[in-house]
């Protein structure tokens, strides 16, 4: 029994992960000792209840025992099946006191064993039930360690931030943004857009601190259908906002509003567009056959419709200037990075492959462009909601 393999007792993927076994194992097999104690105690009780009949049988032969009488006595004990009990009867006079002493001794031994086992504290038991750090999954931690995916999960429960706490925490996406965890977040890691597998940096500016760079709040992708059969993943995009700009423009207005009410608040998205908050969209081309003039035509068509809806008397010169940046001689193979950035003074700056290709000063054009992602009929409704949740988390930390 002492050589029994622990794996045969506890499954390899059991809840305790062998920790409880390794912490509470005592040589000699506790199960066997407990069974032995119970067996002795039961035997003593049975002997006590049967001692009256045994004494009567013995008293008939206790005077002048002959060989024959001794054989009869042996027959009596064999008939009573006394040999099954772990006691040896060596006394001629078997009295109630004899069995009483045995029972008392057995009970005392059983109590002592129970007290000895009780010395294993509940604290040790609790410690044994907690898995070791090396077998804990990253999902069980407050912040993901080394995880590349910071996309939201639809089934995550959103909690309202308690008021007047030192480190307020909001569940935004799959990360908890609190005063402590946000500071320790690994901003050097990449976030992966799941459909295309394209990576986006958490900070838009390389080698920049969180205080002077836009941070990633959502990723998404644009898909086009070809002949209603094949879906073409044209590009992936990452949406960035500047936390300081968000706090400065929206912090006071929404600080007292519960996060649960801001989750799908249309006014929040309208204010993000109206208040000239610093934000950027990074596009990464995912299709080798994409042409620069195709990108220009798609943007001009969408922007024109949004400008007309916002203000029918809009000056479209800003749109013409924007379209002129996309010249025929600019190659955009798969992997090309195109950045669009809005500044506080209302400029829309365009960069391709890290090179500045132009800037247009027009607040209407900026609002129309970023309205494609957080306005009416966005590129991705799911990404828009994710942006809203992450911005709410930033506001609650202002």
UniProtKB/Swiss-Prot annotation:
Pfam families reported in the protein's UniProt record: Chalcone_2
Residues binding dodecanoate, per UniProt: 222, 235, 302
Coiled coil: none
Keywords noted in UniProt: Chloroplast, Plastid
InterPro entries named in the record: Chalcone_isomerase, Chalcone_isomerase_3-sand, Chalcone_isomerase_bundle_sf, Chalcone_isomerase_sf
Phenotype of the disrupted gene, per the record: No visible phenotype during vegetative growth.
GO terms assigned for molecular function: fatty acid binding; intramolecular lyase activity
Name used for this protein in its record: Fatty-acid-binding protein 2
Organism: Arabidopsis thaliana
């Amino acid at each position: 029994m002492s050589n029994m393999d622990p794996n045969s007792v506890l499954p390899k993927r059991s809840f305790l992960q062998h920790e409880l076994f390794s912490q509470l194992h005592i040589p000699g097999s506790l199960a066997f000792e407990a069974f032995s104690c119970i067996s002795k105690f039961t035997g003593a009780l049975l002997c006590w209840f049967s001692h009256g009949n045994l004494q009567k049988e013995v008293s008939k032969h206790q005077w002048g025992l002959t060989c024959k009488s001794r054989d009869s006595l042996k027959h009596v004990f064999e008939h009573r099946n006394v040999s099954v009990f772990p006691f040896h009867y060596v006394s001629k006079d078997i009295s109630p006191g004899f069995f009483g002493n045995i029972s008392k001794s057995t009970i005392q031994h059983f109590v002592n064993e129970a007290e000895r086992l009780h010395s294993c504290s509940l604290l040790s038991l609790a410690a044994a039930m907690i898995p070791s750090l090396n077998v804990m999954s990253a999902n069980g931690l407050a912040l993901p360690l080394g995880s590349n995916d910071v996309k939201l999960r639809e089934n995550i429960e959103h909690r309202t931030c308690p008021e007047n706490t030192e480190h307020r925490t909001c569940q935004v996406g799959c990360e908890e943004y609190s005063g402590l965890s946000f500071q320790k977040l690994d901003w050097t890691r990449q976030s992966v857009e799941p459909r295309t597998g394209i990576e986006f940096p958490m900070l838009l500016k390389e080698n920049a601190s969180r205080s002077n760079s836009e941070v990633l709040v959502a990723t998404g992708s644009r898909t086009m259908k070809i002949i209603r059969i094949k879906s073409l993943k044209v590009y992936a995009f990452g949406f960035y906002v500047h936390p300081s700009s968000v706090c400065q423009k929206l912090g006071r207005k929404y600080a007292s509003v519960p996060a649960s009410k801001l989750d799908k608040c249309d006014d929040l998205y309208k204010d993000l567009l109206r208040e000239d908050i610093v934000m950027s969209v990074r596009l990464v081309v995912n299709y080798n056959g994409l042409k620069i003039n195709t990108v220009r035509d798609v943007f001009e068509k969408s922007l024109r419709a949004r400008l007309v809806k916002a203000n029918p008397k809009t000056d479209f010169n800003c749109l013409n200037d924007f379209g002129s940046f996309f010249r025929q001689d600019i190659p955009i193979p798969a992997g090309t990075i195109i950045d669009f950035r809005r500044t506080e003074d209302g400029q829309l700056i365009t960069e391709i492959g890290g090179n500045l290709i132009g800037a247009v000063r027009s607040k209407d054009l900026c609002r129309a462009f970023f309205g494609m992602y957080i306005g009416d009929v966005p590129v991705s409704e799911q990404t828009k909601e994710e942006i809203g949740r992450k911005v709410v988390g930033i506001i609650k930390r202002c």
